[in-house]
Amino acid sequence: MTKVLVLSDTHGYNDRWLAVMKLHNPDVVIHAGDHLTTKKFMDQNATFWVAGNHDVVGEEIQMFELEGIQFVLMHGHQAPRHDLKQWYKMLVDQAKSYLCDVLIVGHSHIEHYETIDGIQVINPGSLEIPRNPRKLPTYCNLNLSQGRISDLTFHFPRD
């Protein structure tokens, strides 16, 4: 089993990110952009990461495989943000060309999980600037096992 921490939109506030990493001790850390920090910090603290619309370092899209699962990672600013349902559909349409099983995005600052056209879409929300109705910061943990996501949990830290 592989333990994965997924986060996004930390916007340069790294203390909570580092505390969450210490709390969960993940095997893999995925950051979906708007990190607003240095390449060195990202390389030291994230296994896979992309640039968001506020970042000056990083690739826009990463593709990788974990436990036999094909992932595409992008921030989400690659599609115009209309209503969220339409926005996710546009991102999935882009991701289809990569033949992925899972698409991880950020940008909206709102946690989300659903399957669209056979692709699992995960948005961990924002650890620092949440826009969900409760205005709580969010991140996500995944457990990967035998070619599938065996557990997906959103967390809402209050400290």
From Swiss-Prot:
SUPFAM superfamilies (UniProt xref)? Metallo-dependent phosphatases
Superkingdom, natural source: Bacteria
The UniProt transmembrane annotation reads: none
Q: Which InterPro entries match?
A: Calcineurin-like_PHP_lpxH (IPR024654), Metallo-depent_PP-like (IPR029052), PdiEstase_YfcE_CS (IPR020935), Phosphodiesterase_MJ0936/Vps29 (IPR000979)
Textual note on the cofactor: Binds 2 manganese ions per subunit.
UniProt-annotated binding residues for Mn(2+) 1: 9, 11, 34, 109
Do you know which PROSITE patterns this protein is assigned to?
Answer: UPF0025
Q: Which residues bind Mn(2+) 2?
A: 34, 53, 75, 107
Which is a Pfam family this sequence falls into? Metallophos_2
Which cofactors does this protein require? Mn(2+)
Keywords tagged on the record: Hydrolase, Manganese, Metal-binding
GO MF annotation, one: metal ion binding
EC number(s) stated in the UniProt entry for this protein? 3.1.4.-
- Which family does the record assign? Belongs to the metallophosphoesterase superfamily. YfcE family.
PANTHER family, alphabetically? VACUOLAR SORTING PROTEIN VPS29
Query: What name appears for this protein in its UniProt entry?
Result: Probable metallophosphoesterase MPN_126
